[in-house]
Regions:
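N-terminal single-pass transmembrane signal-anchor helix
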Residues: 2, 8-35
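N-terminal export/targeting and maturation segments
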Residues: 3, 47-48, 63
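Intrinsically disordered, low-complexity repeat segments enriched in small/polar residues
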Residues: 5-6, 145
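A generic fold-level signal
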Residues: 9, 46, 109-112
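Aliphatic-rich helix starts adjacent to a transmembrane/signal segment
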Residues: 32-52
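Extracellular/periplasmic head regions of type IV pilus-like filament subunits
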Residues: 59-121
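Short, surface-exposed interaction loops/tails
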Residues: 108-145
């Protein structure tokens, strides 16, 4: 047996429905913005971690050989197998791979005693390039200590 609704109360009003839809829309927008921001920060964290991993491998190479690998003789590929399982790649694909530049070339030995590593980060607040000039499109980097 159905109970009759009290007089004057037939369901939700249009205003109540519109307010509910507006609240849901605002919460959805906040969720989408947070999701995009979290993904961007995660990709940047991976880039910074990759740069640190390459930096560590370069330092191990230098401790074994006394100098850093020359870019013309393979550069970072010299690190694979012995110091790195593989060369890390950018989380968004190979559109902006990591860049290695050997520096401080010795005129007497022909060996490199410095380097710069570059990545392209999405968060403008993380930009840090200790080496200049930096390659076009790259805004984060480090150099040998």
């Amino acid at each position: 047996m159905k109970k009759a609704m009290p007089a004057g109360r037939q369901g939700f009003t249009l205003i109540e429905i519109l307010i509910s839809i507006a609240i849901i829309a605002v919460l959805t927008a906040i969720g989408i913005v947070s999701y995009v921001s979290i993904n961007r920060n995660a990709r940047d964290a991976k880039r910074r971690g990759d740069i640190e991993q390459i930096r560590s491998a370069l330092e191990l190479y230098r401790s074994d050989y006394g100098y850093y690998p020359a870019p013309a003789s393979g550069g970072l590929t010299n690190l694979v197998d012995t110091y790195l399982p593989s060369i890390p790649s950018d989380p968004k694909g190979d559109t902006n791979p990591y860049v290695y530049q050997a520096t401080n070339l010795s005129a007497t030995t022909g060996q490199y005693y410095g380097y710069c590593l570059f990545a392209s980060v999405e968060n403008a607040n993380l930009t840090n390039t200790l080496c200049d000039p930096k390659p076009n499109g790259y805004n984060y980097g480090t150099k040998n200590p």
